[in-house]
Amino acid sequence: MVSKPFQRPFSLATRLTFFISLATIAAFFAFAWIMIHSVKVHFAEQDINDLKEISATLERVLNHPDETQARRLMTLEDIVSGYSNVLISLADSHGKTVYHSPGAPDIREFTRDAIPDKDAQGGEVYLLSGPTMMMPGHGHGHMEHSNWRMINLPVGPLVDGKPIYTLYIALSIDFHLHYINDLMNKLIMTASVISILIVFIVLLAVHKGHAPIRSVSRQIQNITSKDLDVRLDPQTVPIELEQLVLSFNHMIERIEDVFTRQSNFSADIAHEIRTPITNLITQTEIALSQSRSQKELEDVLYSNLEELTRMAKMVSDMLFLAQADNNQLIPEKKMLNLADEVGKVFDFFEALAEDRGVELRFVGDECQVAGDPLMLRRALSNLLSNALRYTPTGETIVVRCQTVDHLVQVTVENPGTPIAPEHLPRLFDRFYRVDPSRQRKGEGSGIGLAIVKSIVVAHKGTVAVTSDVRGTRFVIILPA
C-alpha cells in the first residue's frame, strides 16, 4: 500500500485571509447583483410607463368612432413622428398590417421570437431581438437599435363587440442595456481592485492580529531547563489565547515537577549507591592494609556480600519502578483469595515479628480479587515490613480485608508514633523519609512504599495513608 505524501495544512493566516476575503468579496458581488437587478427593474418600469403613455395617446385617436380609417392613420402618423426610438404597427381584425412606422420594418414580423419580459412587474410585456436599425440616441447622433420592449393591445371602434385594430408598440431599450453593461463592467473593475485591496488589508490585519501569538511563542522559546518556574501571564494576552496560556502553564508546571523529581531521584540514587560503595572500598582497603587471618577475611567478604545484596535489591527495585513509569508493568491476573495471600506474607514475617515482640493478626473476609499474586504479595510485604519497623514491642499489627460495593479494601494498621500531616502526601515518593537521619540504620532503601503504589495503580486501584494517635493505616482499594 502506497502511503500518501504528507501535506502540511495551510497556515492560519492563509485560511483566515481566504475566508474573510471570500466573505467580503461575496458580499460585494451580492450588493452589485442587487444593484444591477434594481436598475433593470427600474428601467423596465420606466419603459412600461412610456409605453402606457404612448398607447393611451394612440388609443384616443384610434377609438374615435366618427373618423375614417384614412383620417385615423394620418393622425396616427403625425403623433408617431413625435416619438423617437419607438416603432408602431397596426393590424386590422383580419390580421393585415394597415400601418407601421415609416422607414422601418414591420415589427409584427419579429413577434414570433418575442419572449416575456421577466423584469416587467404585471401586464403582458415582451422583449424583441430585432429589427436592427439606426435611430436617434439619447445624446447627439444616431445609434444602432436592435433590442425592444413591446406591448400589444386591441384598439379602435367596436364591431360585433370587438375592437377593429390590434396595436403593437415597441420601445428601444438599447440605451438602457448599454448603461447596464457599462455599469456591470465598472462594478467588475471595481470589484477586482477592491478584492486585491481586501486581500492585502486582511493579510495585514491577520499579521497584526497574530502578534500576541508571536509574543507568546517568543516567551516560550526563552524558557529553558533553568527557567521552569517561569509562568506566562494570561492577563496579558487576548481572551482567545487565555486558555492556551493556562494550558501551557499547567504543562510547564508538570514538567517542572517531573524535572524536580528526576533531579532529586538522581541525587537520591547516587547518594544511596555511594554509601555502600564507600563501605565496600573502605572495608577492602582496611583488609588489604596488612596481613589478615582467614577468619578476618571471611568477615570482610560477608560484610561486602551484605552491601552488594542490598545494592542488587535496590537496582532490582529501581528497574521495577522504571517499568511502572513506562507503563510496562502488566499484572498477570488470576482470581485470588486475599486471606490466603496475607497468610503467606504472615508466614514469611513470623520469625521477625517474634524477635521484635510484635503480634500479626488478620481480620475480615476471604476477599476475592483478580490480581497478580507475586505483585500483590510484594505490596503486602512492603507494607508489613514498614509496619514492623515502626511498631513498638508488645503491640499488634492488624491486616483487615473487606468487600464494599464491588471494591476490595485491604488495611494494614499498626500502632506507633503518629506521622505529621505534612509528611503524609509524600510518603509514596521515592527515597522520601520522615526522619532523614535514620536512613542508614536499617531503615530500607526508601522506595518500598513507591513500589506499593506502582503495584496498586497497575491493578487499577488506589492506596492512601492516614495517621493519628491510634496508629498509622495504609488502605489499598482494588476492583473486585
Curated annotation (Swiss-Prot):
Instruction: Give the matching PROSITE patterns.
Output: HAMP, HIS_KIN
* Histidine kinase domain ranges (all copies): 268-480
UniProt keywords (A-Z) are: ATP-binding, Cell inner membrane, Cell membrane, Copper, Kinase, Membrane, Nucleotide-binding, Phosphoprotein, Transferase, Transmembrane, Transmembrane helix, Two-component regulatory system
Main localization of the protein described in the UniProt heading: membrane
Q: What class of enzyme is it?
A: transferase
Q: Which domain of life is it from?
A: Bacteria
Q: What modifications follow translation?
A: Autophosphorylated.
> How does the UniProt record describe the way this protein sits in the membrane?
Multi-pass membrane protein
Q: Which GO terms describe its molecular function?
A: ATP binding; phosphorelay sensor kinase activity
Instruction: List where the protein spans the membrane.
Output: 16-36, 187-207
* Keyword Cell membrane among UniProt keywords: yes
InterPro entries from the UniProt entry? CusS-like_sensor, CztS_silS_copS, HAMP_dom, HATPase_C_sf, His_kinase_dom, HisK_dim/P_dom, HisK_dim/P_sf, Sig_transdc_His_kin-like_C
Please report the name of this protein according to its UniProt entry. Sensor histidine kinase CusS
- The organism is Escherichia coli O6:H1 (strain CFT073 / ATCC 700928 / UPEC)
